[in-house]
């Protein structure tokens, strides 16, 4: 099947030229290209057009889960008939195993796995290994971490056909080898049950149950059942059951792995004994022997990932298998916000190695633990044959890789220009800033202020409040959900200014912000380099009156480069608007009000994996409460419904909410949630009478 891009929009501005240049580069097999796109220029739409025109299976890399979820939702809207997958870390919480020699403290691994995200990861692997080429996988850097051997995953797929002869016991053994667990009492995801000649398999990668009906070792029928009702959804002539985990192996390899672990254990014991360290020798013997017995008895043990090299059939030091191994050879990689994502990929391995060195040297793990690791940056580069870096501020690495040839996308569909930049003396920066914020508030606009330290952010917030400004601060010690709430309050006009340090750059979409103020802009360093300054200034690029003020006593090289580049972009944007008769238009976007913390907690429990994307997406679209009110106005008059009718409506709305959440349709999910809460409130009032 081919990629088919569906959108009411057509490429405009300098999008057509950027698309042409990038497509031409991909078809000419250029190893690296860069798309320099300003905030609001439609970079995601350009990515989608490149994918559609090149027809390449594509991996899109993002530097965090929330932005990855936004990209995933957008790509699904562009390619509704193609396979768009989401692959991020499936941990809600993860505390790695560690040993601190200085205090002789051993820390057990502790984790919480999000089953919804695990399902999405498995779906991505299954789709890629199915042979489809119309596949887009949106991923975090989780894609460079180890997974099972893709060949083993493929070999453990179970292909079934109506009329096929198969021994029932053999089929059950194959299901167990594919990591499914027998459960004849309560069928759950990843389980199967066998009753008579009927075998039901609750697939992990989809929300369906596959029913296999046998008749004298012949497959009589293959049906999929609705998980909730148990009713038949569809009949199939053939069906392939994917493994229940991306960490799977064959029985032969598992048997061989146990033998290899025993050999390496003997060598490590002799090594410690040669050093005269009987404590470590006994520790490693005890721990690994127990692990091996667990593997023999139940097929796994705590920390089994530290033995992954044996199960994968890899040699010592050989790189791990990862998601990239599941793609065909001609796949395309798009690195979004590359100035952040590339350094993140580069830095993944260092801390991992240091932590495991302590475990290995002190007899807690075999040296094979070193081979359970993310890809090194060199290994990542070797696997990626063609890459497009996407950023408003590409770093030197990206520019060097593409030899300075950059596709520019500086024109916004709205005609908005990059913000004006002013430099003002820092000696009077606080008083001047206060005056500017008051002007901003008078125009019903908002402001963002970036400081150099967390302490200064808090002190400035207190100062603003004392002078009648509704403000709040954001920095790394502020909880994630609180950050989202604060930004939503800024958009809603409940506060006028947000003061931050380094959390107001990539991915923050705030059309109401007309003023960005950068305090101590002349303090060179990570927070005030060209990339950081340009990204921060860009937060005012979605407002018609956008302006940035840099408070500084001297103009640094980074400041000058930022101003020169911004002026170059403004000149090109103004020239384009003049030539095409375009009048810049203010972006008008609706807002949703976040729930209070207790409601957020309840909603997280209902939505599971996707609460953070839902919360983040609430910054876009019409207010969910307004939508809920409009539903009531359109005919569902809840004030006059009976208790049974209200309960039915609540159940129906909850089901629709969960369906939307699973589909990552965040706005619809939020809409249904608020409507359900309104119904529940009315029901509570009726039942108390």
What are these regions, as identified by a protein language model?
Residues 80-89, 303, 446-448, 460-482:
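Conserved RecA-like helicase motor-core motifs
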Residues 28-34, 56-57, 133-135, 445-446:
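Pre-Walker A (Motif I) flank of P-loop NTPase domains
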Residues 1-36:
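Conserved pre-motif I regulatory segment
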Residues 28-50:
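Walker A/P-loop
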Residues 87-432, 436-442, 461, 465, ...:
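N-terminal cationic and glycine-rich segments that engage phosphates or anionic surfaces
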């Amino acid at each position: 099947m081919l990629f088919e891009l569906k959108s009411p929009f057509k490429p405009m501005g300098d999008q057509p030229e950027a698309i042409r240049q990038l497509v031409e580069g991909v078809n000419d097999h250029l190893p690296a290209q860069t798309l320099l796109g300003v905030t609001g220029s439609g970079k995601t739409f350009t990515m989608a057009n490149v994918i559609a025109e090149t027809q390449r299976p594509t991996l899109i890399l993002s530097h965090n889960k929330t932005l990855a979820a936004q990209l995933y939702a957008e790509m699904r809207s562009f390619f509704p008939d193609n396979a768009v997958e989401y692959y991020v870390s499936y941990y809600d919480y993860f505390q790695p195993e560690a040993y601190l020699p200085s205090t002789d403290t051993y820390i057990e691994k502790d984790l919480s796995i999000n089953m919804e995200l695990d399902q999405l990861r498995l779906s991505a692997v299954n789709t890629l290994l199915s042979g489809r080429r119309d596949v887009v996988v949106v991923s975090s850097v989780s894609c460079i971490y180890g997974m099972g051997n893709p060949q083993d995953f493929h070999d453990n797929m179970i292909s079934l056909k109506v009329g096929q002869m198969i021994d029932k016991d053999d089929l059950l053994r194959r299901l167990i080898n594919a990591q499914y667990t027998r459960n004849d009492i309560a069928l759950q995801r990843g389980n199967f049950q066998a009753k008579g000649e009927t075998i039901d398999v609750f697939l992990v990668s989809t929300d369906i149950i596959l029913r296999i009906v046998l008749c004298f070792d012949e497959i009589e029928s293959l049906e999929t059942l609705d998980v909730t009702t148990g009713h038949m959804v569809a009949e199939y002539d053939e069906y392939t059951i994917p493994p229940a985990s991306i960490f799977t192996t064959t029985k032969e390899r598992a048997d061989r792995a146990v033998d290899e672990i025993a050999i390496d254990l003997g060598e490590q014991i002799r090594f410690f004994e040669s050093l005269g360290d009987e404590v470590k020798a006994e520790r490693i013997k005890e721990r690994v022997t127990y692990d091996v017995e667990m593997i023999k008895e139940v097929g796994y043990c705590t920390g089994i990932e530290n033995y992954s090299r044996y199960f994968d059939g890899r040699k010592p030091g050989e790189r791990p298998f990862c998601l990239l191994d599941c793609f065909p050879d001609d796949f395309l990689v798009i690195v979004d916000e590359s100035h952040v994502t590339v350094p993140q990929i580069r830095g993944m391995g260092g801390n991992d190695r240091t932590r495991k060195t302590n475990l290995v040297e002190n007899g807690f793990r075999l040296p094979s633990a070193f081979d359970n690791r993310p890809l090194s940056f060199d290994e990542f580069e070797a696997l990626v044959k063609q890459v497009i870096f996407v950023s408003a501020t590409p770093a030197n690495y990206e520019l060097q890789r593409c030899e300075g040839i950059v596709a520019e996308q500086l024109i916004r569909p709205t005609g908005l220009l990059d913000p004006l930049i002013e430099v003002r003396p820092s000696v009077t920066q606080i008083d001047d800033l206060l005056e500017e914020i008051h002007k901003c508030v008078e125009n019903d606009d908002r402001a963002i202020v970036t400081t150099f330290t967390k302490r200064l952010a808090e002190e400035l917030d207190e100062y603003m409040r004392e002078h009648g400004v509704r403000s709040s601060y954001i920095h790394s010690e502020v909880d994630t959900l609180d950050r989202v709430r604060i930004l939503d309050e800024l958009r809603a006009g409940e506060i006028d200014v947000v003061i931050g340090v380094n959390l107001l750059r990539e991915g923050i979409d705030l059309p109401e912000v007309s003023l960005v103020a950068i305090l101590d802009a002349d303090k060179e360093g990570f927070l005030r380099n060209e990339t950081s300054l340009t990204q921060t200034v860009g937060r005012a690029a979605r407002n018609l009156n956008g302006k940035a003020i840099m408070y500084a006593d001297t103009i640094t090289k980074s400041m000058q480069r930022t101003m020169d580049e911004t002026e170059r972009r403004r000149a090109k944007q103004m020239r384009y608007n003049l030539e095409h008769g375009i009048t810049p238009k203010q972006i008008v976007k609706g807002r949703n009000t976040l729930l209070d913390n207790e409601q957020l907690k309840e909603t997280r429990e209902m939505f599971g994996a996707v609460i953070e994307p839902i919360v983040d997406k609430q910054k876009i679209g019409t207010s969910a409460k307004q939508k809920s009110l409009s539903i009531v106005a359109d005919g569902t008059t809840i004030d006059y419904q009976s208790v049974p009718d209200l309960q039915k409506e609540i159940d129906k709305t909850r089901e629709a909410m969960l369906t939307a959440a699973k589909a990552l349709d965040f706005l619809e999910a939020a809409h249904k949630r608020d409507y359900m809460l309104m119904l529940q409130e009315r029901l509570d009032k009726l039942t108390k009478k």
